């Protein structure tokens, strides 16, 4: 199997191309979510179908991520990265001119194919060009770009929709994508690159694609379709299990695997990957719950939610360069443990929010979470790959990033189901106290009827107001339960830290392998 060769060319140009591409791809994931209601209104799409705008992208994204290392060896960094940027840019333009929901979903799938390649490839390009002594700061700078995207996405999306239309959340990618593709093509030099001549593992690629698409569909649509009460979900779940298990067995047996699972023989890597899965669960599922709580309970607009994340996450931008310097100078396991405690604490704080939460109460958990993520992000990657051979790190890095994405998808599906079921159960429990003969209920009912005394039927209006208050209280309790469940699940990840081995070698070398 051909080894990845060092990259030459303009360091500034390569940095600009890598950062622009990564920032664009990461922003696009979050910027679309704030536009779903406008897209739905534009196309007249049913509420249960509009989610395919995000689902189609996610399916393509998770399929391409583990294959990116193979494509890099096959076509080279410059050709693959520039080609992925152009595909992403073209698909963005097509999304803006989509004429109905099916056409938009198809174009989003094309966009996901390009986007799934951009993040891992831009990381490899950046660390392939910088000398080892500069890898620590290069990693911190890249992390800043990757983290800035989710913070800016909702804010930029909300502004564009307010002043123009949803079409511009896609059109804004066109000049950025063209610039990044042009700069990468003229800057990246691979004079010693020789394309891999290994046979194409068509069977492995096919099994992976079918399995990941089926799995992502189940995770995205399962709660909406009643999970295993729907035969389509049952069929696709079985398809995902059969294809992915067969894929793993096939990759372990074939002499030229498209994804090398043998890296899991390394205990430290396996523990770090499991921990990364839980990080993805806590991060994405926690953000999902927080945004949903702010929107449904506190009635925040999408732009207001984006500003909440922006105000609470500035500490992350300051912490990343500091952590980049600490990696290798102190025991990375201590940094990871501190980060886990911070993320767990933020989920615990979220678990005590109420319908009366003010801006300070909403911002504090985001601040604490950002602090924890700042300490966990880079050292976890370094520890994961520190005990692996350089030839193993390509597949290992792809799998490592994929587990975080899968953790987010599974965690979000889990929390979506939990909130629905918990809210119903809490509403049933609270209804037992809505007894007309209960003195406390009678007092609250009189207050409610007094609040609507000027309405035509204050008695019935009072009962309706009490019912809405019970619904709201049940929803708040459901969200609290979801956050606290996530906190408990993520706190368990502290035990995985004991399985991590102290990295050997220079921080620069390890940081290079981590990316």
Region locations from a protein language model:
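Residue-level hotspots within transmembrane alpha-helices of multi-pass secondary transporters
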Residues: 34, 66-67, 151, 155, ...
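Helix-loop-helix hairpins in multi-pass membrane proteins, especially solute transporters
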Residues: 65-205
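Hydrophobic transmembrane architecture of multi-pass small-molecule transporters
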Residues: 35, 49, 179, 404-502, ...
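Transmembrane core module of solute transporters
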Residues: 10-85, 92, 102-104, 143-145, ...
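Short, Lys/Arg-rich, polar N-terminal cytosolic tail immediately upstream
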Residues: 1-7
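Small-residue-rich alpha-helical segments with characteristic i,i+4
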Residues: 137, 142, 148-154, 158, ...
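Short helix-capping/hinge motifs at transmembrane helix termini and TM-loop junctions
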Residues: 99, 131, 187-190, 223-224, ...
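C-terminal membrane-cytosol helix-exit motif in multi-pass small-molecule transporters
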Residues: 175-193, 210-221, 239-253, 493-501
């Amino acid at each position: 199997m051909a080894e990845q060769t060092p990259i030459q060319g303009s360091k500034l140009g390569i940095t600009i191309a890598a950062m622009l591409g990564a920032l664009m791809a990461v922003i696009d994931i979050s910027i679309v979510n704030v536009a779903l209601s406008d897209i739905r209104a534009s196309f007249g799409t049913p509420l249960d179908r509009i989610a395919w705008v995000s689902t189609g992208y996610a399916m393509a994204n998770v399929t391409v991520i583990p294959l990116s290392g193979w494509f890099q060896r096959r076509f080279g960094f410059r050709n693959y990265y520039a080609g992925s940027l152009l595909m992403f840019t073209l698909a963005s333009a097509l999304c803006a001119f989509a004429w109905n929901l099916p056409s938009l979903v198809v174009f989003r799938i094309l966009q996901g194919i390009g986007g799934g390649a951009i993040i891992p490839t831009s990381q490899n390009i950046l660390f392939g060009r910088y000398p080892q002594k500069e890898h620590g700061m290069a990693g911190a700078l890249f992390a800043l770009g990757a983290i800035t995207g989710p913070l800016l996405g909702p804010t930029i999306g909300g502004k564009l929709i307010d002043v123009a239309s949803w079409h511009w959340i896609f059109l804004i990618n066109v000049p950025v994508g063209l610039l990044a593709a042009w700069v990468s093509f003229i800057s990246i030099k691979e004079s010693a690159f020789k394309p891999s001549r290994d046979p194409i593992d068509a069977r492995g690629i096919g099994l992976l694609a079918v399995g990941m698409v089926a799995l992502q569909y189940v995770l995205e649509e399962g709660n909406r379709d009643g999970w295993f009460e729907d035969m389509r979900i049952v069929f696709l779940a079985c398809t995902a299990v059969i294809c992915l298990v067969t894929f793993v067995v096939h990759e372990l047996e074939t002499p030229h695997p498209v994804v090398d699972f043998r890296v899991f023989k390394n205990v430290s890597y396996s523990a770090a990957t499991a921990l990364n899965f839980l990080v993805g669960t806590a991060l994405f599922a926690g953000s999902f719950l927080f945004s949903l709580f702010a929107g449904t309970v506190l009635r925040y607009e999408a732009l207001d939610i984006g500003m909440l994340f922006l105000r609470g996450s500035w500490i992350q931008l300051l912490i990343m360069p500091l952590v980049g310097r600490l990696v290798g100078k102190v025991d990375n396991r201590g940094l990871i443990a501190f980060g886990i405690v911070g993320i767990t604490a933020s989920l615990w704080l979220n678990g005590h929010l109420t319908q009366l939460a003010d801006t300070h109460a909403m911002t504090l958990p985001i601040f604490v979470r950002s602090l924890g993520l700042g300490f966990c992000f880079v050292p976890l990657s370094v520890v994961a790959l520190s005990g692996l051979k350089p030839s193993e790190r390509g597949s290992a890095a792809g799998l490592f990033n994929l587990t975080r994405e899968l953790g987010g998808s599974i965690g979000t599906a889990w929390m979506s189901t939990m909130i629905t079921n918990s809210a119903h159960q809490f509403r049933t429990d609270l209804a037992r106290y809505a007894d007309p003969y209960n003195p406390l209920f009678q007092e609250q009912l009189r207050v409610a009827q007094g609040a609507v005394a000027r309405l035509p039927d204050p008695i019935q209006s009072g009962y309706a107001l009490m019912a809405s208050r019970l619904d709201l209280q049940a929803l708040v309790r459901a969200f609290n339960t979801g956050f606290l469940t996530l906190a408990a699940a993520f706190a368990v990840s502290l035990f995985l830290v004991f399985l991590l081995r102290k990295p050997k070698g220079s921080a620069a070398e390890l940081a290079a392998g981590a990316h």
